[in-house]
From Swiss-Prot:
Pfam families recorded: UFC1 (PF08694)
Similarity field: Belongs to the ubiquitin-conjugating enzyme family. UFC1 subfamily.
Name this protein carries in UniProt: Ubiquitin-fold modifier-conjugating enzyme 1
Keywords: Ubl conjugation pathway
Active site, renumbered: C116 (glycyl thioester intermediate)
Functional note: E2-like enzyme which forms an intermediate with UFM1 via a thioester linkage.
Coiled-coil segments: none
A GO MF term: UFM1 conjugating enzyme activity
Domain of life: Eukaryota
GO annotation terms (biological process): protein ufmylation; response to endoplasmic reticulum stress; reticulophagy
Protein's organism: Branchiostoma floridae (Florida lancelet)
InterPro entries: UBQ-conjugating_enzyme/RWD, Ufc1
UniProt key word Membrane: no
């Protein structure tokens, strides 16, 4: 089930109304507007809560997204490139968020660095089509994944802070 903090986060992200994917042309433009509004609201909420942890941008068509996410541990910032494509069957199918530089470092990842979200996130997404969008995928998918996986990867020495990497060279 969803904990109280997650419920609070979700309640502050606008729900989307337009059920449209990249093939739906005019409706897709409307959906993209809703996506951007939800993302802007989510980022603003995070900044107010001193919990700013990602930046995203897209190509002109809104079908390819890329940016950075970060995780703080022991007062050190670990930053990662993220990317994903909007599936043709979106919003029925959730985007598969990838962190390519972490590929092969954890079992909770698929080929290409796509993070594993099947057990918890995908059923929740399926029950909330078309209300959930990219901001929800970040809040319910990537955010919790980073919170669990990155500390584990750091403790195993599989992820190092960029300052530590430079000192070793």
């Amino acid at each position: 089930m969803v904990d109280a903090a997650t419920k609070k986060t979700l309640s502050n992200i606008p729900l989307l109304k337009t059920k449209a994917g990249p093939r739906d042309r005019d409706l897709w433009v409307q959906r993209l507007k809703e996506e951007y509004q939800a993302l802007i609201q989510y980022v603003e909420n995070n900044k107010k809560e001193d919990n700013d942890w990602f930046r995203l941008e897209s190509n002109k068509e809104g079908t390819r997204w890329f940016g950075k996410c970060w995780h703080y541990q022991d007062l050190m910032k670990y930053e990662f490139e993220i990317e994903f494509d909007i599936p043709i069957t979106f919003p029925t199918t959730a985007p598969e968020i990838a962190i390519p530089e972490l590929e092969g470092k954890t079992a909770k990842m698929y080929r290409g660095g796509k993070i594993c979200l099947t057990d918890h996130f995908k059923p929740l997404w399926g029950r909330n089509v078309p209300k959930f969008g990219i901001a929800h995928a970040m809040a319910l998918g990537l955010g919790p994944w980073l919170a669990v996986e990155i500390p584990d990867l750091i403790s195993k020495g599989l992820v190092q802070h960029k300052d530590d990497q430079q000192q070793q060279k």
